Amino acid sequence: MLTLPFDESVVMPESQMCRKFSRECEDQKQIKKPESFSKQIVLRGKSIKRAPGEETEKEEEEEDREEEDENGLPRRRGLRKKKTTKLRLERVKFRRQEANARERNRMHGLNDALDNLRKVVPCYSKTQKLSKIETLRLAKNYIWALSEILRIGKRPDLLTFVQNLCKGLSQPTTNLVAGCLQLNARSFLVGQGGEAAHHTRSPYSTFYPPYHSPELTTPPGHGTLDNSKSMKPYNYCSAYESFYESTSPECASPQFEGPLSPPPINYNGIFSLKQEETLDYGKNYNYGMHYCAVPPRGPLGQGAMFRLPTDSHFPYDLHLRSQSLTMQDELNAVFHN
């Protein structure tokens, strides 16, 4: 039995024909592909018109996508500064103007709403305008106070109503609310704090602490008084008697016949009694120079010192003036000796 090799061309002529046909088809497909792409690009270019801004944007994107530099070196990836062109500057300027216009309109609307809220809130003044935060706080308190009235079902007291309105508000706003509701601000402060607004204590008590001396005791017949009001009876003419043998004619009246009352004090730096509203210190200095030859009975300047009540604290100016008087007496004594 004879056998022929499989590779000979005589045996399988059809297979060679198929092979040639397949190769020709593949070559034709490769040639047709670039032609079809070029036709599609031409057709799209005719039908679609590009805007100048879009062209510049696409060109910039293409430039950004390039990974190689002009020299062929790889570029650094990341944020790069874009080229400042006229179109880009105009776009940035237009966006900024739009943002400013939106913010301006928003603020105008907010201010109009706050003005309408100020007309409703119980606080009106022709000269003073509430701030934004004070208006919102007062509106919140007003809504809460009205809701409490509806919940209780009774008409509240005016004082409590104002107290509820003024929670967390500043002092000028509180005064405006009290004036709008025809309520005295002083009485409102007294009611709100639960204690009197005016105190009998001196404003200088924080700077000058009280001095307690064993010599200053409660006068007879006045044991029920507090320690803050206690005062030892003292003859204010002792300074006059220390320089002269006889007593002063002005001190002929008995000492403290009526109830005790501390002398009025002017806190402007001047200690004055009821008879004297102002003191001329230049005359006191001349008076000391004129009568300095008379020797005092006690130590130098002892009679010139005043004994003060325990609760009366005087400013620093008064202490300086009393010290200046004693120093003047010492200088006079030195010059005459």
Curated annotation (Swiss-Prot):
GO MF terms held by the record: DNA-binding transcription activator activity, RNA polymerase II-specific; DNA-binding transcription factor activity, RNA polymerase II-specific; E-box binding; protein dimerization activity
GO terms (BP aspect): axon development; dentate gyrus development; positive regulation of transcription by RNA polymerase II; sensory organ development
Recorded coiled-coil stretches: none
Biased composition (Acidic residues): 54-71
Motif Nuclear localization signal in this chain: 80-86
PROSITE patterns from the UniProt entry: BHLH
Record InterPro entries: bHLH_dom, bHLH_transcription_factors, HLH_DNA-bd_sf, NeuroD_DUF, TF_bHLH_NeuroD
Region (Disordered): 43-82
Keyword line: Activator, Developmental protein, Differentiation, DNA-binding, Neurogenesis, Nucleus, Transcription, Transcription regulation
Domain bHLH as annotated: residue spans: 94-146
UniProt subcellular location: Nucleus
Any one GO cellular component localisation term in the record: nucleus
Subunit text: Efficient DNA binding requires dimerization with another bHLH protein.
Function of the protein: Activates E box-dependent transcription in collaboration with TCF3/E47. May be a trans-acting factor involved in the development and maintenance of the mammalian nervous system. Transactivates the promoter of its own gene.
Protein name: Neurogenic differentiation factor 6
